[in-house]
Amino acid sequence: MPLQIFNTTRKELHEELLERTVIDVLDSEGFGVESIVAVYCGKKMIRKINREFLQHDYATDTITFRYSDNREIDGEFYISLDVIEENARRFEVDFKLELLRVTIHSALHLIGYDDQTVDGRLQMQQKEEFYLNRYSEANNQTPS
């Protein structure tokens, strides 16, 4: 299967919705899937990856690695469900919607969007809102 989802936590996820979301974001942006691994993990694991590969000693919501430069995406992303839960409380949003937002954010990173500048961050936020509205309202589902 070109997109594999792994959940290393005890939290239940609506994996089919998350998979459809990633594939649809890529397709809508003109990209396909060669091979993508999506790992939903805890705070400890994402902090270790952040420290080992990016030299940042803290937990974050998502880390994305892209291994191809063509329109067929080969890559992986890690999402910390613990950080998602913390952010959902902090921003007073539903955990499921925050999880969907960060999954969309990760898909956007895979295709080359960057949030390291003000303009890039704004562009990503607009794309996130577009896709978040598309999936949360059109499907009337959340990824739980």
From Swiss-Prot:
Key words, A-Z: Cytoplasm, Endonuclease, Hydrolase, Metal-binding, Nuclease, Ribosome biogenesis, rRNA processing, Zinc
SUPFAM superfamilies on file: Metalloproteases ('zincins'), catalytic domain
Chain residues that bind Zn(2+): H105, H109, D115
Purpose: Single strand-specific metallo-endoribonuclease involved in late-stage 70S ribosome quality control and in maturation of the 3' terminus of the 16S rRNA.
E.C. no: 3.1.-.-
GO molecular function: metalloendopeptidase activity; RNA endonuclease activity; zinc ion binding
Comment on bound cofactor: Binds 1 zinc ion.
Protein name per Swiss-Prot or TrEMBL: Endoribonuclease YbeY
Family: Belongs to the endoribonuclease YbeY family.
Cofactor names: Zn(2+)
Entry's Gene Ontology cellular component terms: cytoplasm
Subcellular location as annotated: Cytoplasm
GO biological process, alphabetically ordered: rRNA processing
Origin species: Chlorobium limicola (strain DSM 245 / NBRC 103803 / 6330)
Lineage of source species: Bacteria, Pseudomonadati, Chlorobiota, Chlorobiia, Chlorobiales
